[in-house]
Amino acid sequence: FKCCRLIFGEADHFPGLTVDRFNDILVAQTLSLGIEVRKELIFNLLYKILREQGEEIRGLYERNDVKIRLLEGMEENKGWFAFAETAEPGEPLTEIVENGIKYNVDVENGQKTGFFLDQKYNRQAIAKIARGKHVLDCFTHTGAFALNAAAGGAAAVTAVDISAEAAQMTDANASKNGLDKVVKGLKANVFDLLSELVNNKSREF
């Protein structure tokens, strides 16, 4: 419950609204005008319910930096939602644990809401087939697939992303889990790298 999707749009009868929980931070993305005009009510109720259940929530960060909002006359924006009862929430960074692996999550700059929660079981599957293998993780983002492969016994994992910040985050997450001798983040264009590897007969992958 510390790391999960709390509201999943139409499936939960909130069309255009996604709310993810990452430890002590909620992250919301509002894509419909109908939800936008009611978000203050919804967010405050959600916060109240969680607090009444004894959950520690530092704040709610809005990730509305998506162009689809323009189609409904809404502006792109991101930042902390102002709860009346909460103190200054601080940095939009937190730590989560999934499949026994710890991650730093940047809810301000990470893709989507900061972490791809829907890939949890795919990451588990990777861990089961990675033992002894040399693994190439493309579009690594936070290094989640790479770290699960390493935790599953991979001999070596190269985690590639065009973002230098993503590669650095992967290295930091690997170090946090004692997997830095196995996982290495690499800043590179995946498509260029794959073309090079096709012609590299000595490649390990």
Where are these regions (language model features)?
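Short secondary-structure junction motifs
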Residues: 1, 55-57, 180
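Conserved short alpha-helical segments that host acidic/polar catalytic motifs at enzyme active sites
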Residues: 1-9
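Non-catalytic substrate-recognition/targeting regions of SAM-dependent transferases
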Residues: 9-20, 40-115
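Phosphate-centric recognition/catalysis
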Residues: 24
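Short histidine-centered catalytic/ligand-binding loop motif
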Residues: 27-39
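Rossmann-like S-adenosyl-L-methionine
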Residues: 88-205
